[in-house]
Amino acid sequence: MAKNDKQWSSATPGLLIILLDQSGSMREDYEGTTRTKFATLAVNKVIDNIIQKNFDGEAPKNRCFISVIGYDNDVKELCSGWLKDLDASPLRYETVKKQVIKESHDGAGGILEEKVEIEEKIPVWVEPVEKNGATNMLGAFQLAKELAEKWIADNVDGPAPVIINISDGVPYYDMKDPRDCMKETVALANEIMNLSNNDGNVLIFNAQIDDSNGKVVFPLNRTEVSQEEAQFLYDITSEVPASYKAAAEKNKLPTKEGSRGCIFGADGVQLIHLIDFGSSKGQGDKGLS
């Protein structure tokens, strides 16, 4: 039985699909900004982290193809490409201030640590959307399914695709009852998770941009989150494969047998640490956040 243990490499690259909720509710305040800005920053961090994680000399190795799909009333691909292409073509760079620890010698054999503020340029591939709109998560998963099916047909022996959905809640579209929207989306997500190649089944991970449940990482059962929206996301999440658990432990992410690959009250960047890229096998990811 396939175990989802194929390493993402130049010879066997993987497909990462990121679904980004851009609905009206994402305009609400969150962590000193808005949910949509927070989530969009997370997507840009994910892309940048993967590029840096796979850098070799002057350019990243093409161990991954990334597709970012945004959804509100409509569904559209916001950006896509191999790592080298994405590295060479951000929309712009944003300058942000960041606190770092600077070490210096005290003259007596000791080390002094001092917090200093530096400016850092962050590449931007996806811009936040600030408008009212529905939550056509179903349509986003439909497009993701099409991309995954095509990838699997062309990459029978490569890593099974991974889909990361970053959202604040439940699907709502076509003026339907939200409960019907959830049922339809759960059914489609199950279809996607049943897709497979020689490596294993397609994996769906979820990150909820909401702090109603506090911070919950890789829950073992749905009772660990009480909110309906969180339980819905739990229901459309794959179990963390055993082959991913070494990477999880390496990055201090708690997993147990049967844990689902969903996190609540976080930005989703942690989910990237589960993927075994060629450059990071057996190594920690201390530089990533």
Where are the regions that the model predicts?
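Acidic, low-complexity intrinsically disordered regions
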Residues: 1-289
